[in-house]
């Protein structure tokens, strides 16, 4: 508000906003909410979130000073929100992240930088040169589409495109895989409360290549739909009367003791979503193929079944997900018949004989050539 402030230039100002961006420039307001002055400030997301002016070298140095503070505190990495919106130009953004990455790696060569770039993989790919990883929004959207439509026909093609683009940009790239985040309707709401689909989503997440990220509450089946405050409701650790850790900044619309089983109670239920996440996490943690392996398509992929391999040295896994509400029977070829160790299966899943497999509705099967 103060034109004389030394920090005035930390923000973007103009008296003549561009005609095509009038909805992103705002006049400051006084304590009574009345617009003041004739200079507009820029806020890409909202008037409550003015953008920093990183064309100002002083602002860049201020950001570096803050980052250094946290590095010296022992922070191992940063999640970089809206990494494509530093400037309104992708090349300029990438130049900025090259500068920041070099600075941080100079302070701690193992610092990990993950960028949130909500865009198609061809736009995201250049960002994984300065950054260690980016959230894979395309893969997330593909998985959600499969879960909702029960149609996996396009999965192999989409996965191959994503992997190819990212490898060309950075052969050592690390994918960051997720189901939903703080800007999207929650998974359990997207699948209409279907617990079997929520469990399968977890199986998909933990068997795809990359680093799995879990949005808080996803592991206990929290629900929520836009606007943002309703997809960011307080997590339920225990029953409300015995839950001093539960935050109460708002009255939840979707998540309470009647609609969601709190985490502490799910711990004691072997079939709970939380314990399912724990099991899949343990399987992944103990498998080099799932943690580090390459991904390859399988001829078994179809409308009804997501199918892919995870391969690490001599270790070979075949991952099968029946994405439909009906049983599906598959015929294994001679090569797949050699994968005769079951790493994971749903409780009712049955192998009919040596080369026929029946997957239960929303069932997942992981086969391997060794344990």
Feature annotation, model-predicted:
Residues 31-55, 178:
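N-terminal small/glycine-rich loop or linker at the start of catalytic domains
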Residues 45-60, 83-92, 146-150, 185-193:
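The substrate-binding groove and active-site-proximal loops of carbohydrate-active enzymes
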Residues 107, 181, 186, 192-317, ...:
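Loop/helix patches that line or flank the sugar-binding groove of alpha-linked glycan CAZymes
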Residues 1-17, 66, 76-171, 175, ...:
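Active-site-proximal helices and loops of the catalytic beta/alpha 8
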Residues 327-346:
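Beta-strand-rich binding/interaction modules
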Residues 352-371:
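C-terminal beta-strand-rich structural cap/linker in extracellular carbohydrate-active enzymes
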Residues 2-40:
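N-terminal carbohydrate-binding accessory modules
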Residues 57-71, 198, 202:
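Short, acidic/polar
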């Amino acid at each position: 508000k103060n034109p004389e402030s030394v920090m005035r230039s930390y923000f973007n100002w103009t008296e003549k906003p561009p005609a095509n961006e009038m909805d992103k420039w705002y006049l400051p307001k006084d304590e009574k909410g009345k617009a003041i002055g004739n200079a507009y400030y820029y806020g890409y997301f909202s008037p409550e979130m003015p953008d920093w002016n990183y064309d100002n070298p002083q602002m860049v140095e201020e950001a570096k000073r803050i980052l250094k503070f946290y590095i010296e505190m022992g922070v191992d990495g940063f999640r970089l929100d809206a990494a494509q919106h530093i400037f309104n130009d992708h090349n300029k953004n990438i130049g900025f992240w090259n500068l920041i990455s070099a600075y941080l790696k100079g302070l701690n060569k193992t610092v990990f930088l993950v960028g949130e770039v909500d865009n198609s993989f061809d736009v995201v790919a250049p960002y994984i040169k300065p950054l260690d990883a980016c959230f894979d929004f395309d893969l997330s959207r593909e998985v959600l589409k499969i879960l909702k439509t029960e149609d996996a026909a396009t999965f192999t093609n989409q996965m191959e495109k994503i992997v190819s683009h990212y490898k060309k940009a950075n052969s050592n790239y690390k994918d960051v895989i997720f189901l939903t985040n703080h800007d999207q309707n929650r998974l359990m709401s997207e699948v209409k409360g279907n617990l079997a689909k929520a469990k399968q989503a977890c199986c998909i997440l933990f068997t795809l290549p990359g680093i799995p990220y879990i949005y808080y509450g996803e592991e206990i089946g929290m629900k929520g739909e836009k606007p943002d405050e309703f997809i960011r409701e307080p997590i339920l650790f225990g029953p409300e009367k015995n839950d001093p850790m539960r935050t109460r900044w708002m009255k939840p619309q979707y998540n309470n003791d009647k609609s969601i089983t709190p985490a502490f109670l799910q711990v004691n239920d072997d079939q709970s979503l939380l314990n399912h996440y724990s099991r899949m996490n343990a399987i992944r943690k103990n498998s080099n193929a799932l943690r580090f392996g390459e991904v390859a398509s399988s001829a078994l992929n179809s409308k009804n079944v997501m199918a892919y391999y995870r391969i690490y040295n001599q270790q070979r896994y075949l991952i099968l997900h029946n994405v439909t509400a009906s049983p599906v029977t598959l015929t294994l070829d001679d090569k797949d018949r050699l994968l005769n160790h079951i790493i994971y299966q749903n409780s009712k899943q049955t192998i009919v004989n040596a080369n026929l497999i029946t997957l239960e509705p929303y069932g997942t099967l992981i086969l391997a050539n060794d344990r």
